Design a protein with these regions (language model features):
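Conserved active-site alpha-helix within GNAT-family acetyltransferase domains
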Residues: 116, 128, 140-158, 163
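A short beta-loop-alpha structural element at the N-terminal edge
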Residues: 23-40
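Conserved acetyl-CoA pyrophosphate-binding loop and the N-cap/start of the following alpha-helix
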Residues: 109, 113-121
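Conserved GNAT acetyl-CoA-binding A-motif
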Residues: 98, 126-137
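Acetyl-CoA-dependent GNAT
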Residues: 43-102, 106
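Active-site acidic-Proline motif in GNAT/NAT acetyltransferases
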Residues: 106-108, 112, 140-141
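Acyl-donor-binding surface of acyltransferase catalytic domains
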Residues: 1-23, 169-171
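Short, charged/polar, Gly/Pro-enriched secondary-structure boundary elements
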Residues: 172-179
Length: 179
């Protein structure tokens, strides 16, 4: 795929599905018109500081953090049928082979399959972008997220019941299958 085709694929990415409660959910690339809505969602997120110190507790720090994700990442949002953001995932460049992934589903929309679809969408985009490995860090106590990541093929690089657990997904096999 040429860089132009790759960018077009990423820019136009969208995926819709029906969640476990029967609601239509659209996952699409974050566009300029949604930046303020994403910031407002993170400012309203409760409890703040609930996953690895994120979102930041102080409003100013939270806004800066969201802008950094918008600027530095490839961002997807999950939208409910009325257009409200119910989840967010981002891929961040580490180096030519590796990227980092962050995924958040707002608490009232958890356990509906949205997180799993966001993770799968990020994996798809990371693959399309040519990355060989997706890395993430998750709070050891966040068993729901750890289950989703394992279900999507991630393997634990570290373990424990306290602190953070590092996980990674090797995409190299997927690249070789295409050739």
């Amino acid at each position: 795929m040429s860089p132009k085709e790759e960018e077009s694929t990423i820019r136009n990415y969208s995926h819709s599905f029906v969640d476990r409660k029967g609601e239509a959910i659209l996952i699409k690339k974050l566009d300029d018109s949604m930046h303020q809505a994403l910031i407002k969602k993170y400012l309203a997120y409760q409890p703040r500081d609930s996953f690895e110190g994120l979102p930041p507790i102080e409003d100013e720090a939270c806004v800066k953090w969201v802008w950094k994700m918008i600027r530095d990442g490839t961002n997807l949002v999950a939208l409910a049928s009325e257009g409200d953001i119910v989840g967010h995932t981002a891929i961040f460049f580490i180096d030519r082979q590796r990227c980092e992934m962050l995924t958040v589903v707002w608490p009232q929309f958890q356990s509906r399959g949205i997180g799993t679809e966001l993770v799968r969408s990020s994996i798809h985009l990371a693959h399309e972008m040519g990355f060989e490995k997706v890395w993430l860090s998750v709070d050891a106590a966040n068993l729901r997220a750890r289950h989703i990541y394992k279900e999507c093929g991630f393997e634990c690089l570290s373990s424990g019941d306290r602190g953070d657990v590092e996980m990674a997904l090797d995409l190299k096999g997927q690249h070789e299958e295409e050739q």
